[in-house]
Amino acid sequence: MAHERGHLQLPRADAIRSKLIDTFSLIEHLQGLSQAVPRHTLREILDPACQKKLMLGDQEQLVRFSIRARRMGHITHAQRLLSRLRVRCGGRPPLSLWAGWVLDSSIFSNFIISLIFLNTFVLMVEIELMNSTNTSLWPLKLALEVTDWFILLSFIVEILLMWLASFFLFWKNAWSVFDFVVTMLSLLPEFVVLIGVSADSVWLQLLRVSRVLRSLKLFARFPQIKVILLALVRALKSMTFLLMLLLIFFYVFAVAGVYFFKEYSRSTIENLEYNMFFSDLLNSLVTVFILFTLDHWYAVLQDVWKVPEASRVFSSIYVILWLLLGSIIFRNIIVAMMVTNFQNIRNELHEEMTHLEVQYKADIFKRRIIQRRQQSESLRGTSQGKVSEDITETSEATDEEKSEAEESEEEKSEEEKSDVEKSDEEKNDEEKSDEEENDEEKSDVEKSDEEKNDEEKGYTEKVYSGRTFVERSYAERSFAGKAENEKVQKELKEKAYPGSPPNSSSHDEAFAADDTYLENLDWETLVHENLPGLMDMDQDDRVVWPRDSLFRYFELLESLQYNLEERKRLQEFAVQALMNFEDK
């Protein structure tokens, strides 16, 4: 079927095809091995007792391997490396495998986290002792300097281990690149001092301050902080155009402020506190941002009103309009978008967690089903053992009964010989008594035969109770399925002909009308009408399908997956065609 559909490959269709092959053993038929059908399962091979028995008795038989899909979690780089042929066939494990093992160990991770906290504490103490001239504190400063170098070297060793584990994956990970940049920025001032740059240089002081950025290495260590940062980045991405619009309004109001407050900025009146706020474009942008935060807006407005040349109306309109647009409207929009984005992220995480919970419950349910099957198989094995014991007991009982019957027959033959040797007179006199005794013996023999037959029937019923129970269960299931089908047909008949009695003379006509009704009935209505009855049925009942029907069912189900995929693509093509048509 997959070759008929071309290069299109669907996981569902492949799963259905594998199920079909597993059910009907098509691999053996295609390879000409239909006569060699596997008789044993993998469970029997794994069982030591069964394996020993099979190896002693039947070594050349095939084994059916039941391959099931297994959900794998996060596959680490070390696991990928272990599955490579070069590593598996090599004599010694590579250094990259050892480096990955060290990086993944909890001891090393906790050691790096403790160094990050220690680095924060050391920087805090160094800042406090920076301007101190007390000579008694020099050993403490030396210890802090040594600790700082030890922390820096530990971070460099960590980066080297990451490179040794996988150099290309290191540069593909954004958190690893961030870690590398922070470490190199803290290492750069030491090299600059070795080159000969003065320690009092401003750039060198800035580079030394960059050592504080080592505390940001915690972001890459805790997944919770990563989630918060990713949520912030995602929220800012969704607000890109809103921020662009806000920046445009910032620029417009900054330029307008330079023109509106020109007299105020050039005024010679003394005691003006904010006359430099609108002197040029940069100061005007800073002032607009201050007004955006609702800070000093009334003080600035009162200071502007001190200048008679500045219009009170235009200055008031400028400030109030910017407060309405920027501080009230834009700020609330930003807050609302941030809240909605965080809510969407939370809903997505909640859906993912519920999906994982449902998947976990489904796995537990599957395990219970497997345990139930194993228990049923063990019960069948015990019942078969009991049946074999009953068979041996009945065979021994029948042998004993046969020996007793032979002994009784020999005694009767001896008695008859002694009776023949008697005289004729005694025979004539005792004919009547003999006849009566013979009648009594016949009745006793018949009774004993009947009792033997009853006992044999009881034994046979005990012997074959297990087998007949299994056969009855299968027959009862098929009969129950037929009864359910007849019940559904009766309900459909009653819906189609509500006034007709069930036992009418025109049974054939009603049955023909029922067939026509089922043919004309829509599939969805048929399913909806029969769905309550199907839900009320016992879920343990199984319907046995014929082999050809089951094979056809799998084929149709596989073709349905391809048809659904083709329908989806046709819908996409139709949408694309309509969009192109509207563009033209």
Curated annotation (Swiss-Prot):
Residues 376-460, 480-510 are annotated as: Disordered. GO terms for cellular component: CatSper complex; sperm flagellum. It is a multi-pass membrane protein. The keyword Calcium applies. It is found in: Cell projection, Cilium, Flagellum membrane. Activated by intracellular alkalinization. One of its GO terms (molecular function) is calcium-activated cation channel activity. It holds the Pfam family Ion_trans. This is Cation channel sperm-associated protein 2. The lineage of its organism: Eukaryota, Metazoa, Chordata, Craniata, Vertebrata.
